[in-house]
Amino acid sequence: MPQKDPCQKQACEIQKCLQANNYMESKCQAVIEELRKCCARYPKGRSLICSGFEKEEEEKQTLKCTPQ
């Protein structure tokens, strides 16, 4: 049986929040932050749900390292 994603609960909370708030992301910042905290607790690649945040962080690092 496949192992459950460790941050699935937080991802579901985001979906519930977005649905309850007409998909206004600004109203769900607290639950989004909880998912970020969950993702930070696990090694890269451990959570499929966190892969979007991991990609976002990689892009930020690339931009910081790119000479202007």
From Swiss-Prot:
Q: Does the keyword Zinc-finger apply?
A: no
Q: Which InterPro entries does the record match to this protein?
A: CMC4 (IPR027179), Cys_alpha_HP_mot_SF (IPR009069)
The record's disulfide annotation reads C7-C38, C17-C28, C39-C50
Q: Which Gene3D superfamilies match?
A: CytochromE C oxidase copper chaperone
Q: Which PROSITE patterns match?
A: CHCH (PS51808)
Looking at the keywords, is Disulfide bond present?
yes
Task: Show the SUPFAM superfamilies listed in the entry.
Answer: Cysteine alpha-hairpin motif
Q: Which Pfam families match?
A: CMC4
Q: Which residues form the CHCH domain?
A: 4-46
For the motif Cx9C motif 1, give the residue ranges. 7-17
Cellular localization per UniProt = Mitochondrion
Where does motif Cx9C motif 2 map?
28-38
A GO cellular component term found in this entry reads:
mitochondrial intermembrane space
Say where the protein is mainly found. mitochondrion
Which UniProt key words apply to this protein? Disulfide bond, Mitochondrion
Domains: entry comment: The twin Cx9C motifs are involved in the recognition by the mitochondrial disulfide relay system.
Give the family per the record.
Belongs to the CMC4 family.
Name under which the protein is recorded: Cx9C motif-containing protein 4
Source organism per entry reads Bos taurus (Bovine)
